[in-house]
Amino acid sequence: SPTGNWAALKDWAEGNEYRDLMESKLAGLRYQNTAARLPKMLARKLFMKGGRFYGSVTKLQNYRSCPYQYFLRYGIGVEERDTGEADYLDYGNYLHAGLHQFGEVLKSQNRQWRQATDEEIEKISEDITEKITPRIKADALSSDQSAKYTRRVLDQTFRRALQKFRQWSRQSGFDTVDMEKEFYLRISASPTDSFTLTGKIDRVDTDGRYAAVCDYKTGSPNLSLNEIMEGLSLQLITYLLALSKTKDTKDLLPAAMMYIYLHGRPKSISVPPNGIPHAKEKENTNGIFLNDPDVLRTLDSQSGTDDGFIGVSYVKDGSVKKTSPVLTAEQFEALKALTEKILIRLYSRLESGEIAIHPVKNGTLSPCSYCPYRSICRFDPALPENSFDYISKVSDKTIREKLDEEMKRNGKENL
């Protein structure tokens, strides 16, 4: 029979000089593209230098997106080859540094964005960019004509952001009180184990009672309740959690957590005939806000109009539209409590040595799309042992109901 013939051939090959060749060929049939759980002691050595986890919330988000990618990047330190060219990360750092330095100039003079003049925006921004340009990838933004054009786009984006900040400040009762505010958030994972999250909040605005945390973005990400609950978008809510556990800010109530868009991505902008760069204007922010029209109109007196900077709308009686991205004060508290549980769960998985090749798939988005380690992990959804971690779509309404249930369960219906 055919089976008997193959068995006889296999026995013959194993008995002579073809044995090693046959074993190497058959190994491919037995290969499983998986990553075994690391021994706990090894995991702690790789991920917890000094015996304790001390890192950013972004790291835990990255771990949630793909444990194996995290292992390669932060565990054994596999790095991408540096081309020497400025990239989107460098563009973001350029704009972040510029906005921070301009804000520090105003802060040193006890002034707000609303008080900056056109002349100051022009002159101070020029001085700042002259100082920070050489620091970007060994002056990569001055290397050739293409790089110089990129810098022109970035400089225009920087000035445009300053003008928008000034206009928003003029129609807001909130003041910017901190920029790149450092925080250290220690969380107890168990009675005998804890970890510390560190980071910098790009901007904190407050009216004395309420606080808005802001993160500058050169892209246009959307802040999603579903992604927060799935552990994929924990940055902003962790900022609010950190403020609530810091002595000088613990009494501030959440007014908003939002991304502020810095438009003008160089490689997506074509050179117009007159040689002057331009950028398509879109919405200014994206976030989740407090369901309190008085607070929101203090944050932005033009909210709900074409001149508003925050994405909320109102009905005729003045209340906030149900379709707006808002939470009640109680729901914000519940979300912070759940976020702490999510962070603990991610830390516990990491600490236990779980490094599965199991990337998330959120709609059409997956970390595999931009992962530099594809040739190492060789993830292939066609293999039976490889599969995506699919993210379920849960409506904001359902999540709000879950937050209400969480508050009742904790007996915290009232702040």
Mark where each language-model region is.
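Structural signature of nuclease core domains in nucleic-acid processing machines
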Residues: 1-415
